Amino acid sequence: PEADELLLTLKGPNGSFRLSMSASASLPFIYLTPTNKVSPLTAPTFCMVLRKHIANGRITKIYQPGMERIINFEIEHLNEMGDLCHKVLIIELMGKYSNIIFTDSDGTIIDSAKRIPASVSSVREVLPGRAYTIPATQEDKYNPLTVDSKQFVDIISAKPLTVSKAIYSSFSGISPLVANELAHRAGLDADSPVAAYSHDELLHLGSNFTWMMEDIKNNRFTPNIVRDGNEPKEFSSIELTQYSDLTVTKYESISEVLELYYSERNT
């Protein structure tokens, strides 16, 4: 529908679905939706490239590299000669650096929603013919799904930071919102230094951390939106207990949450 937005129709044994994704700098997203959007009279070039290659393709694998804000779709399709080919559609949800990138099976970029030349980024070009490289955003962080409560305490205690910042700067995939939620559940002030708390208090924080990670590993999610009156403030796939003065509404799926949140933000 837009230059930085895609709406894919997916067909499977359980019916048809629409997958909406956007690389908007202000509101990047990806979610399943029942809503169709009116297509422009002239489709964006990137959309035409995708139609040419994967209009009748089959998604064979969907995965997230580590805890990165990236989702990869591996797709197989038949080319004009009837040969089986493989492509990868990648969405990177990284604020103003968000992008949707389409590559060959060997990682060569075919095209992207946003082309990034060397004049814009000397670190990472995103242009047809270039090799795709994953953004180096989480390399120095720990995987939170493999850390126990004692390791957690050792890691954050080594940083002269506030509780919240020590958490989200140490572990991949943990946002300031989640870090604040962990502090709240443990009864700690997210903005106080880690050094202000005793070892036992930090162990209690570590226990809350591991409990949350167990919920994530076992797909125990609580999709919700936090509103101040009618204004959406936050959304999350985990239960948020830190907003006692605001309205927290739970929903059946994270896709429902995302569609509501972004539609309300845009009105």
What are these regions (language model features)?
Residues 1-267:
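Extended, highly charged segments
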